[in-house]
Amino acid sequence: MPGITQNGSVSKASIWAGRIISGLVVLFLLFDSAIKVLALAAGVEGTIRVGYPANVVRPIGIVLLACVVLYVIPRTAILGAILLTGYLGGATATMVRMSDPWFLFPVVIGVFAWLGIFLRDERLRTLMPLRSSAP
C-alpha cells in the first residue's frame, strides 16, 4: 500500500501529505463555522437562501465547530470525520434540494477529510485497507 514503509508504519511523506490535506479541510471548515457562529451577513444570508431560518445559523456553526475540534484532535479524529460526514451529507442534501450547482462541493470536502486521516493514521489503514494483504 502506498505510504506504508516495509515495517508497516506510515511513511513521513504520507503523514505530511495527510496533515496538509487535513489542514486545508480544517481551515475551510473553521472559516465556515466562524461566519455562522459570529452570525456574519454572508453566513446568515446563505443559510436563509437554502431555506433555513436565521435563528439556526449560530447553532449550525457551533455543531460544525465541535465536529472540527474533534477532527483536529488525533485521538478523536475518526469520530470527528464521521460527524463531519453527517454534517456534509446534510449540506449536500440541502444543496441538491435547492438545485444548487455546487452540490458536490461538500462531498469533495468530506472525501478530502477522510483522505487526510487515511494518509496519516495507521489505525484507519488497518481498519479499512484499500487492498487485501492476501496474495
Question: What do these predicted ranges mean?
Answer:
Residues 32-36:
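Short beta-strand/loop turn elements enriched in aromatics
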Residues 14-18, 38-41, 61-63, 84:
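Short hydrophobic/aromatic-rich motifs at helix boundaries and adjacent loops
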Residues 48-56, 71-80, 98:
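Short, amphipathic, aromatic/basic-enriched membrane-interface segments that mark the entry/exit
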Residues 1-9, 50-60:
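Hydrophobic alpha-helical transmembrane segments
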Residues 38, 52, 91-94:
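Charged, amphipathic alpha-helical interaction segments
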Residues 37-49, 63-74:
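Short juxtamembrane and helix-loop transition motifs at transmembrane-helix boundaries
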Residues 27, 31, 52-72:
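Core segments of alpha-helical transmembrane spans in multipass integral membrane proteins
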Residues 1-31, 75-135:
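Extended, low-polarity transmembrane helix blocks
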